[in-house]
Every structure is written in C-alpha cells, then in structure tokens.
Amino acid sequence: MKKQLKRIFLRLLPGWIALMLLIVFVLPTALAATLGTTGRILDQLPYLTGVTVSERISVIAPFFTEEVRHWDEEINRWAQQYDLDPNLLATVMQIESCGDWTVSSPAGAQGLFQVMPFHFAAGENQIDPDTNAMRGANFLNVCLDYSEGDPALAMACYNGGQTIVSKPSSEWASETRRYYQWGSTIYADAGLSKDTSPALQSWLEAGGTYLCDLAAQSLGLSG
C-alpha cells in the first residue's frame, strides 16, 4: 500500500511543481497586467463618457446654492475624512458662509464653517479651507456626541455651544432657535433627495441671499 501511494505521489509531483511555478511567477504578472489595463480604462472614463470624477461622486442634494456646490468635491472628501453626512456638512456651510471661505463674523468666527478662533491650534491658518473644515467637522462631531446623534440638535449645539443641548429650546438664544429651524428643515429636505428646498428658499429670502452674493464675488461666480 505504501509503495502504491509513493508511486502515485511521484507521478503527481511534476504537475504540482508546475502549478506552484505558475502561481509564483506567471499569475502575479498576469494579474498586474489585468489591473493595469483596468486602471487605464477607468482613467479614460471621463473622456469616454463626458462625466468628470466630481460629477460621478457628487452626493450632496442638488438644491444647495451654486456657491456651496462649488465645494462639492471637497465636501464629499471632508465627509469621508471626518465620518459625517455630506448633506449635513453642506447644510452647515450653507447657513454659515454660503461657501465664502474668506468671510469672518463680528464675533470672530472664520471661514467656510465660521469656526471660532479658540477651536484652532496656535499658528493654524484659520481660513484655509481644509484647516477650517477639520476644526468645524471636529466640533460638529462633538455636538453629535452631545446630542446623541440628533443632527438637528447638533446644529443648534454648533451655533450655541454644548450647554444648549441640556436646555429647553425656550431658553436658547433667538439666533440659535433660528439656526435650529433653518438647519433642521434644510437638512430634512436634503435627506429626502429633493431637487428644490422650500426651507432653503425661505432662508435665502430671510437674508441668506446677501451672504450668497458675497460668496459669489469671493469665488468669482458673479456675473
């Protein structure tokens, strides 16, 4: 029996050796060539289809103003980087700056997400879009933790600070109550994938248009 098994093993050995050589030397080369071809095809997709990368990956609602949609690709990247819903980031940017990365408030809030100076580390460029987004997103995540994941309450926290989470809305500052109203309704429309937002239109009519006009000038989008 042992001799029979030995003969079978010796008969199959060359085939096993050939298979191992194929796996070690041939398969990696073939796989690399296949992946390289696939990569080249993917690289050519924008030219073949006329669709740019940013258009393919756009995930924010289409009703946000042109000034906010100008930052679409960055919003998507920041959302992934800081584990946030891109529509939530877009809603905060819409209300805070309408996409004007140079704007500052009388209270000292800076940039796209109107981040207060005490959130920044010494020496940081407070209006740099990536730095501003990092600090704004970090604080928004803090607010989501305080609000136990409630995005509307997190936006109120973003405006009024963490202490408002434990207070009834009747004790909030009027600015925070307005922020909560605008933010929650605009974000709700975005979550429903609407093409238009009555809430955003109301915000624009209540004074948001002026902010967006300034943003358009800053971004070179005004006619």
Please report, for each region that a protein language model flagged, where it lies by residue.
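N-terminal Sec-pathway targeting helices
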Residues: M1-V24
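Hydrophobic alpha-helical membrane-insertion segments, chiefly the h-region
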Residues: L22-A33
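Export/targeting segments at the very N-terminus of extracytoplasmic proteins
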Residues: A32-G99, P129-T131, A137, K194
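Surface-exposed patches in mature extracellular/periplasmic domains of secreted proteins
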Residues: N87-T91, V103, Y146-C157, K194-S197
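Acidic helix/loop microenvironments that form the catalytic cleft of cell-wall polysaccharide enzymes
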Residues: Q94-S97, M116, F139, G149-E175, ...
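Substrate-binding/active-site groove segments that recognize
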Residues: S104-E124, R135-N138, Y180-G183
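A cross-kingdom feature marking charged/low-complexity
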Residues: G183-Q201
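Low-complexity, Gly/Ser/Thr/Pro-rich intrinsically disordered linker/tail segments
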Residues: A199-G223
